[in-house]
């Protein structure tokens, strides 16, 4: 099982996302049925290297957010149209 480190965030919006991307990070969200959504910040290079593996899309991932661990699955990925950059990832809780 692949492991991914994340931080929580409180801000939303285009301006905040742009500031994150300048610092080589990008926004993500973790959500599920009857669960509260968690807004996340991921490191771009680490995530980009992990997403090159087929297991990133087919298997469950272990998402470590501060001191909690969640079993998640990738729901959606937004990529830049011509640069090799990730813009946003949606994660789904796995029971």
Swiss-Prot record:
Domain of life: Bacteria
Keywords, ordered alphabetically: Ribonucleoprotein, Ribosomal protein, RNA-binding, rRNA-binding
Pfam family, one: Ribosomal_L25p
GO biological process, one term: translation
Entry's Gene Ontology cellular component terms: cytosolic large ribosomal subunit
Gene3D superfamilies according to UniProt: Ribosomal Protein L25, Chain P
Signal sequence range: none
GO molecular function: 5S rRNA binding; structural constituent of ribosome
InterPro entries: Rbsml_bL25/Gln-tRNA_synth_N, Ribosomal_bL25/Gln-tRNA_synth, Ribosomal_bL25_short, Ribosomal_L25_dom, Ribosomal_uL5_bac-type
Classification via CDD domains: Ribosomal_L25_TL5_CTC
HAMAP family with a match to the protein in the record: Ribosomal_bL25
PANTHER family: RIBOSOMAL PROTEIN L25/GLN-TRNA SYNTHETASE, ANTI-CODON-BINDING DOMAIN-CONTAINING PROTEIN, RIBOSOMAL PROTEIN L25_GLN-TRNA SYNTHETASE, ANTI-CODON-BINDING DOMAIN-CONTAINING PROTEIN
Function: This is one of the proteins that binds to the 5S RNA in the ribosome where it forms part of the central protuberance.
Family in the record: Belongs to the bacterial ribosomal protein bL25 family.
Assembly information from the UniProt record: Part of the 50S ribosomal subunit; part of the 5S rRNA/L5/L18/L25 subcomplex. Contacts the 5S rRNA. Binds to the 5S rRNA independently of L5 and L18.
Protein name: Large ribosomal subunit protein bL25
Organism: Buchnera aphidicola subsp. Acyrthosiphon pisum (strain APS)
């Amino acid at each position: 099982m692949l492991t991914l480190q994340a931080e929580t965030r409180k801000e939303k919006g285009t301006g905040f996302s742009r500031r994150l991307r300048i610092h080589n990070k990008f926004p993500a969200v973790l959500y599920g049925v009857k669960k509260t959504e968690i807004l996340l910040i991921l490191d771009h290079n680490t995530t980009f290297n992990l997403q090159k593996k087929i297991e990133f899309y087919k298997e469950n991932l272990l998402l470590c957010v501060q001191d909690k661990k969640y079993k998640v699955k990738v729901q959606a990925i937004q990529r830049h149209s011509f640069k090799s950059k990730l813009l946003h990832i949606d994660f789904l809780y796995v029971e």
